Amino acid sequence: YSIESAEAPWSQEGTGYPMGLQEGYYPSTPSDTLTPFRNECVDVLNDSFGILCDNHHHEVATAGQCEIDIKYDYMTNAADGAQSYKYVVRNVAAEFGKVATMMPKPISMDSGSGMHTNVSLWKKDVNTFYDKDEELELSQTGRYFCGGVMEHAKGLTAITNPTTNSYHRLVPGYEAPVYIAWSSSNRSATIRIPGHFKGEKYAFMKRMEYRVPDPASNPYLVFSAVLAAGLDGIKKKIEPGDPVKEDIYKMTKSERIKRGIDTLPANLGRALD
């Protein structure tokens, strides 16, 4: 197949404002030609499906990579929302005379598309992942949850990354997770604990972001599997170790071994083993 886009650096039409490879993050118009498309997607999701979106923007990859963030919800509702999201995006794209793809890696040598999964556990009205006295304001319960997900990360990939194309995305150098580790802001790690909002005022936002899943996966299976892995970590009190602040992409193999940082499966066959 081939991809044609007025935004792409290989465009021959001369009618757009092409972006260089991996230079598509938050561009302004006229380079970003898809703002009206995303606006329409957000309106349809909200008005016809009751799905609220936090924000939308152009993403790193060229040729029209977009991100629309769905507001958090209970697990089953969130999975329903993810499926509805795909349906809406594909149909609105058709109305705009375009084709939307959920392929994890449609363009070689450019960033792929993920389905980052954010999780928090609540007990009545209390977010059990929040503790103001702990590092990154992440509670011990939250640490154990991360430990469980890391413990089962290799097995999870068969569910979170179910196609051969999925593993074209999981390679170093494109902000995709490859290494089984956790951090506050490290995009080379599988787990991130967002920390840009701090304090008890934002306790409800404390969460774990699992960056491995991609949009080719089944969200019902992904959310269930990630939850099961995390709960296993809580049950067995699995420690995730220290958060990794350094860029793991730049570490040597010996440095990673010394730090106990393992890698995700390199292909679907290994994930299924």
Predicted regions and their residues:
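Glycine-rich, acidic/polar active-site loops that bind/position phosphate-bearing ligands
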Residues: 1-273
